[in-house]
Amino acid sequence: MGKKSRVKTQKSGSGAAAAVSPKEMLNLISELLQKCSNPNSTPGREWEEYVQIRGLVEKIRKKQRGLSVVFDGKREDYFPELMEWCKENGASTDGFELVEFPEEGFGLKATREIKAEELFLWVPRKLLMTVESAKGSVLGPLYSQDRILQAMGNITLAFHLLCERADPNSFWLPYIKTLPNEYDTPLYFNEDEVQYLQSTQAILDVFSQYKNTARQYAYFYKVIQTHPNANKLPLKDSFTFDDYRWAVSSVMTRQNQIPTEDGSRVTLALIPLWDMCNHTNGLITTGYNLEDDRCECVALQDFKSGEQIYIFYGTRSNAEFVIHNGFFFENNLHDRVKIKLGVSKSDRLYAMKAEVLARAGIPTSSVFALHVTEPPISAQLLAFLRVFCMNEDELKGHLIGDHAIDKIFTLGNSEFPVSWENEIKLWTFLEARASLLLKTYKTTVEDDNKVLEQPDMTFHSAMAIKLRRVEKEILEKALKSASDNRKLYSKNSEEGTPLPKYEASNIAFVENSVADSKLPVVLKSLDDEEVKLQEAITISEITENGFLNDKDLLPNGTKSENDSFLAEDNQQETGNAKDFCS
């Protein structure tokens, strides 16, 4: 989170582009909105659409050159002011300092010994930028009228940030001046750097992120120019794409969920000082103390004086880190690759499979994950694959009979196979699927290693290549695991090994050995996509206002199967208004 800015943004008023007529700009904005509001692009033509959208954005950026607002000097010049501001307003500032590290950029360095689980950092609510503080700001009147802002807290925070940045008297200015001028998310990649992500499992999310950001910008550009409640916003005379990209990136890399003051629900917040901590493997050690009304963080481990203080951001994959945080984390224990699976409606046994899956709380089509750790599949994916590969008799056994419910509960437990034949089928299927996915890449792991040795490799290019390399490494591990399991269960079948037996009365309490999951599966939170089905704005409402042509677009989140409360970046916000921005 403390990653330094690498490229200097042009200062307002210096070398500004020639004046562009409002009509000319509105025409370009309308063209961009129309292009970004088209239905899903034809499979295989996503790159073509991305290049077209990018071309329009670059035209707009060229005409807006020199109009973006940035601060004089370097962000680190404002660190003393940030520390003083935090101290004056009740945040902890003792025991650490803000410094630049060789690998991660800016972060917190311990100035004394800090013990594991010691409370070393707290930030009171008054310092946080939240959706609630946005409602009470100059943005409030527009927020009260705009359905998109109401539905999407992350966009509200982005505009809150922009408005406060433009106000020389803003309470949060000491914080805002320490934010990077630019970020390392794919929104800042050039076209050649994005090319390195071609054929990866993450590329569609990269395309979607860019398309969504461009659409949001075009929509709000028109809102700011035409909506009566936007008249007093300090953005009316200058709202550039670079401004919006900076704001959404600041929020995307930093936003967290905190409880509202009464504790009845959660809201999004930017947390000054705390968001300078960089990530490492571990456990969530940040929470919110409602009694003292402040965000608190205890030490993840012992830190000696002079060492960098790390926190754990949550169980994110490297695709999520690259797309939403702008860095690649080596040796990520929670890394995974998305895999889309579904039962075909043309399957003769579709109805029975759908019913068994429904009883287990699993949809017939979803996005799962292959994990870097062993075993590579979660309890939910194991359950899905077992049902996917069941024959008619096995399906009947899970639908009718005295022990049908017990069998549903064991679907996600690796210790209780449905049958040896079923187990062989599912691992054979997974082996074939992983093999097919590997064949979609244009390079091998060895090829990627050679490219990474090139001395002129840009930071963004290296990050993209590392991501595509680790995807292949995960798929190769999954392929080997599937092959080993297929051979094991084939041997059990050939030798006539009896299936493991279980006590029906105790089955719901059996701990699952797959991905640290526990039964029953039906009580587990399954998948990324389920969260995104919540809709705050219907398709009909959007089309009536001309935001979309006829249907919603792909989700832009890469949310994991398991979420953390405070340290996750709340990509569900995008899902809450998926018709507009997903």
From Swiss-Prot:
Positions bound to S-adenosyl-L-methionine? 75, 104-106, 254, 275-279, 325-327
Q: Any idea which GO molecular function terms this record carries?
A: actin binding; histone H3K36 methyltransferase activity; protein-L-histidine N-tele-methyltransferase activity; transcription coactivator activity
- For whether the record's keyword set contains Acyltransferase, the answer is no
Question: Signal sequence span per UniProt?
Answer: none
One biological process term from GO is: positive regulation of DNA-templated transcription
Taken from the UniProt entry, a GO cellular component term is:
cytoplasm
Which cellular compartments is it found in?
Answer: Cytoplasm
Q: Which CDD domains match?
A: SET_SETD3
Gene3D superfamilies in UniProt = Rubisco LSMT, substrate-binding domain, set domain protein methyltransferase, domain 1
Entry-linked PANTHER family: ACTIN-HISTIDINE N-METHYLTRANSFERASE (PTHR13271:SF47), UNCHARACTERIZED PUTATIVE METHYLTRANSFERASE (PTHR13271)
* Entry domain remark: The SET domain specifically recognizes and binds actin, suggesting that it does not accommodate substrates diverging from actin.
* Role played: Protein-histidine N-methyltransferase that specifically mediates 3-methylhistidine (tele-methylhistidine) methylation of actin at 'His-73'. Does not have protein-lysine N-methyltransferase activity and probably only catalyzes histidine methylation of actin.
The name under which this protein is listed is Actin-histidine N-methyltransferase
What's the source species for this entry?
A: Xenopus tropicalis (Western clawed frog)
